[in-house]
């Protein structure tokens, strides 16, 4: 779910009880509960390097409907995602990427909620996933995308991704899973983009308002979706954990059809046999293994470097698309729906004054 990763089919696939997931061979597990942030890395070591944070190129504007183009142009230019925020760094990292807060590093020590409402929401999430008895607490932590199929809107902007990762954190108060995903574009030392989303499941009452006739016929009563609360023009996307053993692998669907699926591993390079095994397993759910492409995990960032980078000043505003204070001396009136050109003329001086 960056990238929409971070990132499931509205119609339930062939019952998962009919298939047994292949046994995983790896036992290593990472529970890093880091909060991913995004930045652009420097391609070479400079005396006074700059770290520029940006969410640009996350999504292709052409993928949005024409009726939103003019409004989207203003939103993009006004939002934090359209700005480059530079920070002077004294460290010598060649690929400095700000990924979160150092306080978030470590094991996930989460407990299940005890009140009745939270327990009800937990049960709804467990039943909303194809994976039997899905446990959002055990699912939390760091996952590496080692293979994926990404077509349509959900895959926009991820075609050249390296080192795609997702960090999942279970929010007990909201009974939701926070999803922080990012990837490095073009090459191991390319620029990084990231986005934060939230996975929530819809109960029976809300589902009746939106479910299709086919879904009613199949009696699918709970569904889970990935939303991006701070970016309103991105539609909610289905989210379904097809299968997982929590310690080694997870298979995640992110579209109503068979156009988006991810193979997750707890380790960045589990080996070709691991990847081939789970590609073939997805064939039982209607996916074509030949169309599922490997995701390069070739970024040379050690855990120590990652922890150091995470101790840098936070970029929460960028990740959550919060609007910056422009410091205007007087009010400016924008009307992007009637005059895009006039709006752009007013915006340019704000960013280049």
From Swiss-Prot:
Gene Ontology CC annotation, any one: cytosol
Alphabetical list of InterPro entries matching this protein: Calycin, Lipocalin, Lipocalin_CS, Lipocln_cytosolic_FA-bd_dom
Subcellular location(s) of the protein: Plastid, Chloroplast thylakoid lumen
Claim: DNA damage is one of the keywords in the record: no
Transit peptide feature range: 1-39
Residue ranges with Low complexity bias: 1-18
Disruption phenotype: Increased sensitivity to photo-oxidative stress induced by drought, high light or paraquat, associated with a rapid accumulation of hydroxy fatty acids mediated by singlet oxygen. When associated with disruption in TIL, highly sensitive to temperature, drought and light stresses than the single mutants, exhibiting intense lipid peroxidation. Seeds of this double mutant are very sensitive to natural and artificial aging, associated with the oxidation of polyunsaturated lipids.
Keywords: Chloroplast, Disulfide bond, Lipid metabolism, Plastid, Seed storage protein, Storage protein, Thylakoid, Transit peptide
GO molecular function: nutrient reservoir activity; small molecule binding
PROSITE patterns (alphabetical): LIPOCALIN
Tissue: Expressed in leaves at low levels (at protein levels). Present in seeds.
Region (Disordered) location: 1-27
Primary location recorded for the protein, binned into one broad class: plastid
One GO-annotated biological process of the protein: response to oxidative stress
Record-annotated disulphide pairs: 163-299
Description of what induces expression: Accumulates in response to drought, high light, paraquat and abscisic acid (ABA) treatments (at protein level).
Family that this chain belongs to: Belongs to the calycin superfamily. Lipocalin family.
Biological role stated in the UniProt entry: Lipocalin that prevents thylakoidal membrane lipids peroxidation and confers protection against oxidative stress, especially mediated by singlet oxygen in response to high light and other stress (e.g. heat shocks). Required for seed longevity by ensuring polyunsaturated lipids integrity.
Name of the protein in question: Chloroplastic lipocalin
Lineage, opening ranks: Eukaryota, Viridiplantae, Streptophyta, Embryophyta, Tracheophyta
């Amino acid at each position: 779910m960056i990238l929409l990763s971070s990132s499931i089919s509205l119609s339930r696939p062939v019952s998962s009880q009919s298939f047994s997931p292949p046994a995983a061979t790896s036992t290593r597990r990472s529970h890093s509960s880091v909060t991913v942030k995004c930045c652009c890395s420097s391609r070479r070591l400079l005396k006074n390097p700059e770290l520029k944070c940006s969410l640009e190129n996350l999504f292709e504007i052409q993928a949005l409907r024409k009726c939103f183009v003019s409004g989207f142009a203003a939103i993009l230019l006004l939002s934090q995602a359209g700005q480059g925020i530079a920070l002077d760094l004294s460290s010598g990292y060649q690929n400095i990427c700000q990924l979160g807060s150092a306080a978030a590093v470590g094991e996930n020590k989460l407990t299940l909620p005890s009140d009745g409402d939270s327990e009800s929401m937990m049960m709804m999430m467990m039943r909303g996933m194809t994976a039997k008895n899905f446990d959002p607490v055990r699912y939390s932590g760091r996952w590496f995308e080692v293979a994926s199929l990404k077509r349509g809107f959900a895959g926009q902007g991820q075609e050249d991704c390296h080192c795609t990762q997702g960090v999942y954190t279970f929010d007990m108060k909201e009974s939701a899973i926070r999803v922080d995903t990012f990837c490095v574009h073009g090459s191991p030392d390319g620029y990084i983009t990231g986005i934060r989303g939230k996975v929530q499941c819809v109960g029976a009452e809300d589902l009746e308002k939106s479910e299709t006739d086919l879904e009613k016929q199949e009696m699918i009563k709970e569904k889970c979706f990935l939303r991006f609360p701070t970016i309103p023009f991105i539609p909610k996307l289905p989210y379904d954990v097809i299968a997982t053993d929590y310690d080694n692998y997870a298979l995640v669907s992110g579209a109503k059809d068979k156009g988006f699926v991810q193979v997750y591993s707890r380790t960045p390079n589990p080996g070709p046999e691991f990847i081939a095994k789970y590609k073939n397993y997805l064939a039982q759910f209607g996916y074509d293994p030949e169309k599922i492409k490997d995701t390069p995990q070739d970024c040379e960032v050690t855990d120590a470097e990652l922890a150091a980078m995470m101790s840098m000043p936070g970029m929460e505003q960028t990740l959550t698309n919060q609007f910056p204070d422009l410091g205007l001396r007087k009010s400016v009136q924008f009307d992007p729906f009637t005059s895009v050109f006039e709006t752009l003329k007013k915006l340019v001086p704000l960013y280049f004054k």
